[in-house]
């Protein structure tokens, strides 16, 4: 059984179009609060049937602080903290993330950035070196759906996020009380 799962994951990794991290990433424009509007089916280590997911990123001298928050299916707040960093020789959107309680670090590749408004990127598409994980973050949920959703979906298709494990899954962001976290 485990062997079959590993084969499926291996095949899925090679049927995608190759994505690359962005060459330039201004971390000061990347920090702050993000609302997660899309995830993938494969990456459910922290997420399952969730809503109102946010990511708060801050800057320190050495790292980017990470606090991911969401509501589970019962409306309970779930959070996980950690940090992102550059491995030696990496730059741009080629980061690594380490989350508390998760045994291994993981690639965090920013593969596309939206336009800059008020000194912040409007949206971000994140994946990894195998194109298995997928996250779409936005600064403003309404503006994302009104202005950027079609372009992002086109990009996701071009990047190969169309398979069973990697097909984009919308995270509900309606009736959210973000003051809980």
Regions found by a protein language model. Give the residues of each.
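A beta-rich soluble binding module of mature secreted/lumenal proteins
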Residues: 3-4, 9-181
């Amino acid at each position: 059984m485990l062997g079959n799962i590993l084969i499926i994951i291996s095949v899925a990794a090679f049927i995608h179009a190759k994505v690359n991290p962005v060459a330039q990433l201004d971390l000061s424009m990347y920090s702050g609060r993000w609302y997660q509007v899309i995830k993938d089916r494969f990456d459910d280590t922290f997420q399952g049937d969730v809503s109102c997911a946010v990511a708060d990123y801050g800057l320190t001298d050495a790292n980017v602080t990470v606090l991911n928050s969401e509501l589970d299916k019962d409306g309970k707040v779930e959070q996980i903290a950690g940090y992102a960093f550059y491995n030696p020789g990496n730059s741009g959107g080629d980061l690594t993330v380490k989350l508390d309680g998760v045994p291994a670090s993981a690639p965090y590749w920013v593969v596309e950035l939206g336009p800059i408004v008020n000194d912040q990127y409007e949206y971000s598409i994140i994946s990894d070196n195998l194109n298995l994980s997928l996250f779409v973050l936005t600064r403003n949920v309404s503006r994302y759906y009104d202005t950027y959703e079609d372009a992002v979906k086109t990009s996701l298709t071009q990047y190969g996020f169309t398979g069973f494990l990697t097909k984009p899954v919308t995270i509900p962001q309606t009736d959210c009380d973000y003051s809980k976290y």
